[in-house]
């Protein structure tokens, strides 16, 4: 069977949604691997008025843009509202989600099934993180840093620097 070449008409665009507060090496692992699977990957930062993020939307976007620069087929965007509506607006065919543990799976399965109910043509692709990041979350990174622990190797150097600036009161140059 001859190889099928993907044309722009059949572009496989995926959305990788999240709060990315802060961006971790686990997120970057999924971005790198997702960039190899999809023709285009849109890393989409959720604007959630109900959450009080550590980093502003602009700060998170800038950090993500700086970190995904090496990937030609990855771009950063923001959204609010229903993910399925946003995905359809962007003409995405898939949502990329990371699953670290059974607890993630239960939640993500529920979300994927609801998304399928709302938008049957939108697929959810679950990806396991590299083993080194299977326990890593933004919440843990913030807690470790707040308590004086090292986050080296858990987040990119840029993010570690921004955490220092946030927690120690020096102005960020974003």
Segments (PLM) and residue ranges:
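Nucleotidyltransferase catalytic core that binds NTPs
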Residues: 1-174
């Amino acid at each position: 069977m001859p190889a099928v070449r993907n044309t722009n008409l059949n572009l496989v665009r995926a959305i990788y949604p999240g709060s990315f507060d802060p961006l971790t090496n686990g997120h970057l692992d999924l971005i790198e691997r997702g960039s190899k699977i999809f023709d285009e990957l849109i890393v989409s930062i959720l604007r959630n008025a109900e959450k009080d993020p550590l980093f502003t939307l602009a700060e998170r976007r800038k950090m993500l843009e700086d970190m995904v620069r090496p990937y030609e087929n990855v771009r950063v965007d923001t959204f609010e509202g229903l993910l399925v509506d946003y995905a359809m607006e962007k003409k995405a065919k898939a949502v990329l989600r990371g699953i670290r543990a059974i607890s993630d799976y239960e939640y993500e399965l529920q979300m994927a099934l609801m998304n399928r109910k709302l938008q049957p043509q939108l697929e959810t692709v679950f990806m396991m993180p590299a083993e080194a990041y299977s326990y890593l979350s933004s919440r843990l990174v913030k807690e470790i840093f707040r308590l004086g622990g090292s986050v080296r190797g858990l987040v990119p150097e840029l993010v570690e620097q921004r955490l220092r600036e946030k927690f120690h009161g020096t102005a960020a140059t974003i």
